[in-house]
UniProtKB/Swiss-Prot annotation:
Gene Ontology cellular component terms for the protein in this record: cytosol
GO molecular function terms listed in the Swiss-Prot or TrEMBL record: ribosomal small subunit binding
Species, as recorded: Treponema denticola (strain ATCC 35405 / DSM 14222 / CIP 103919 / JCM 8153 / KCTC 15104)
Protein known as: Ribosome-binding factor A
InterPro entries associated with the record: KH_dom-like_a/b, RbfA, RbfA_dom_sf, Ribosome-bd_factorA_CS
Record note on quaternary structure: Monomer. Binds 30S ribosomal subunits, but not 50S ribosomal subunits or 70S ribosomes.
PROSITE patterns documented for this protein: RBFA
Record gene name: rbfA
Annotated GO biological process: maturation of SSU-rRNA
Pfam families given in the database record: RBFA
Domain of life: Bacteria
Function: One of several proteins that assist in the late maturation steps of the functional core of the 30S ribosomal subunit. Associates with free 30S ribosomal subunits (but not with 30S subunits that are part of 70S ribosomes or polysomes). Required for efficient processing of 16S rRNA. May interact with the 5'-terminal helix region of 16S rRNA.
Family: Belongs to the RbfA family.
């Protein structure tokens, strides 16, 4: 199957699962409406899909939410089968995704760095060496 079709199907799955979470149709109390589906990677034969989940909640609550989604995967898969026009609805695997939180932490670390050199001093020394 073409990569474009797989990416489009992954995006449709992401949107549908997000809608199920936001609408509260998943009754598991571990599944918070603050969970977000970052991306979905569908296998080439459409048999499997990896669903990457993150949240701004603490790591423990996010992992509990992922377990809740795993327990509700049958319901989610049935809902997807009704909405998507595919012969076989992929088997869903939910994965805790730390990449967004790690990215935010990295940006915060970079912003907290203090530079000991003054940019004006660097320009002044560069200009004097060019004049020689």
């Amino acid at each position: 199957m073409s990569e474009f079709r797989l990416a489009r199907l992954g995006e449709q799955i992401r949107e549908e699962i997000s809608a199920l979470i936001c609408s509260g149709k998943i009754k598991d109390p571990r599944v918070s409406s603050l969970l977000s589906i970052n991306r979905v990677i569908v296998s080439g034969d459409l048999a499997y899909a990896k669903v990457y989940v993150s949240s701004f909640l603490d790591e423990h609550k996010t992992k509990q939410g992922v377990r809740g989604l795993e327990n509700a995967s049958g319901f989610i898969r049935t809902s997807l089968a009704k909405k998507l026009h595919v012969r076989q609805c992929p088997e869903l695997t939910f994965i805790f995704d730390k990449s967004i939180k790690e990215g935010i932490d990295m940006v915060n670390k970079l912003e907290s760095l203090e530079y000991f050199t003054d940019p004006d001093e660097d320009e002044g020394t560069a200009g004097s060496s060019e004049a020689d």
